[in-house]
């Protein structure tokens, strides 16, 4: 009889311990879940607060139904009219350069303006090492046969650059840059002046979304005014 009583007593003790252990674990889980919920709520409030405080969160772009972005331009019609006076006036204005680059992208020939911009930056190089590194990068990206963004150059101009690329100077790409400039001025610039991109600017109309092909990152006109000297820009 004593044995039986002791047996039931042990079972009750075990059950009591198991229930106590379960309650401890269950209670701890509730407490942890409550803490996590409070942390998430606090983080959400902080994010919302930052969005309200920072006006730059609203970018100067608008999304079209097709998923492309159309940049809101602040170019005055008077300024746009000046771009039609000469190709040089177009390229010397940051917004003009950007508009022309967007146009070339619609024709899949942006490598021309990218090469021209790269040459402009190359002429600002300082020191033999920087000249050599940038010259090599430009050559491999725009000049050599089957380059990723090979520009259209005559055989002689291309050969001169190839033969001198091991000992480049600040004027190594002058002839090629001049050639590409002439091609853009005589061909692309004429079509640009008749394009919707330019006509919208000249009439003060909102810019339309532009369908762009997907490409790897390239040197853009937005970096023209504050170009980095790091050769990785063109790699």
Swiss-Prot record:
Residues with PTM Phosphoserine: 49, 216, 218
Keywords (A to Z) from UniProt: Cytoplasm, Phosphoprotein, Signal transduction inhibitor
GO terms for MF: GTPase activator activity; GTPase activity
Domain RGS: 86-202
GO cellular component, one term: cytoplasm
GO BP terms, alphabetized: G protein-coupled receptor signaling pathway; negative regulation of signal transduction; regulation of G protein-coupled receptor signaling pathway
Subcellular location as annotated: Cytoplasm
Tissue specificity field: Expressed in peripheral leukocytes, bone marrow, platelet, spleen and fetal liver.
InterPro entries per record: RGS (IPR016137), RGS_sf (IPR036305), RGS_subdom1/3 (IPR024066), RGS_subdomain_2 (IPR044926)
Top-level division of the source organism's lineage: Eukaryota
PANTHER family reported in the protein's UniProt record: REGULATOR OF G PROTEIN SIGNALING, REGULATOR OF G-PROTEIN SIGNALING 18
Function, as annotated: Inhibits signal transduction by increasing the GTPase activity of G protein alpha subunits thereby driving them into their inactive GDP-bound form. Binds to G(i) alpha-1, G(i) alpha-2, G(i) alpha-3 and G(q) alpha.
Name recorded for this polypeptide: Regulator of G-protein signaling 18
Gene that this polypeptide is encoded by: RGS18
